[in-house]
Amino acid sequence: MGSPRSALSCLLLHLLVLCLQAQEGPGRGPALGRELASLFRAGREPQGVSQQHVREQSLVTDQLSRRLIRTYQLYSRTSGKHVQVLANKRINAMAEDGDPFAKLIVETDTFGSRVRVRGAETGLYICMNKKGKLIAKSNGKGKDCVFTEIVLENNYTALQNAKYEGWYMAFTRKGRPRKGSKTRQHQREVHFMKRLPRGHHTTEQSLRFEFLNYPPFTRSLRGSQRTWAPEPR
């Protein structure tokens, strides 16, 4: 069923058509009705079109916008340690806090929540092959190297592969990668927490508010106009 607002809009449109038909005569009435109907539909299209555009653009790589780059560690809920990308292209969740191989650079792929993750020390991207195994690649342009960040109700983050929907980045209690085909969003193995590397300070933390001292103001009346004048010191 349509909303009351839509029904009211249609009723008003019909009334307007009838009024114009009465003024313009029988020959002009139907044409006016068609023109008004097209205008009415055009006024309702932009919202749906914009929503469709957002959905379509969130599924493809954004080549126009400036990419947001973040640096942090991924703390594994099951292993109790951090995800690392080693020089031998192995990926596990066995790194201690502050380990240089646990420092990850996360690049946004779209204006949505899709990202590419690479090791800051090795420059290798975390990807997933057709068997659901996590692999490291020097070229992360493929869709298999794109993950969708999903913030869960427990405040943990899950990373779902963009190419293999329903397959997640996951690690066992021993920090070994788990095949994406055996993962589900509710499993602890796919839950991660973002943490800043040890000793890393964000720009926001280094900023301090600066307050400017202005003399106090009092209100005075000059004739019929109100002005502001500083208090005498």
Swiss-Prot record:
It comes from Homo sapiens. Its main location: secreted. Glycans are attached at residue 155. It holds the Pfam family FGF. Monomer. Homodimer. Interacts with FGFR1, FGFR2, FGFR3 and FGFR4. Affinity between fibroblast growth factors (FGFs) and their receptors is increased by heparan sulfate glycosaminoglycans that function as coreceptors. InterPro entries: Fibroblast_GF_fam, IL1/FGF. The keyword rRNA-binding does not apply. Residues 1-22 form the signal peptide. Keywords: Developmental protein, Differentiation, Disease variant, Glycoprotein, Growth factor, Hypogonadotropic hypogonadism, Kallmann syndrome, Mitogen, Secreted, Signal. The lineage of its organism: Eukaryota, Metazoa, Chordata, Craniata, Vertebrata. The keyword Plastid does not apply. SUPFAM superfamilies: Cytokine (SSF50353). Disulfide bonds: none annotated. This is Fibroblast growth factor 8. It is found in: Secreted. It is linked to Hypogonadotropic hypogonadism 6 with or without anosmia: A disorder characterized by absent or incomplete sexual maturation by the age of 18 years, in conjunction with low levels of circulating gonadotropins and testosterone and no other abnormalities of the hypothalamic-pituitary axis. In some cases, it is associated with non-reproductive phenotypes, such as anosmia, cleft palate, and sensorineural hearing loss. Anosmia or hyposmia is related to the absence or hypoplasia of the olfactory bulbs and tracts. Hypoplastic femurs and pelvis: An autosomal dominant disorder characterized by isolated bilateral hypoplasia of the femoral and pelvic bones.
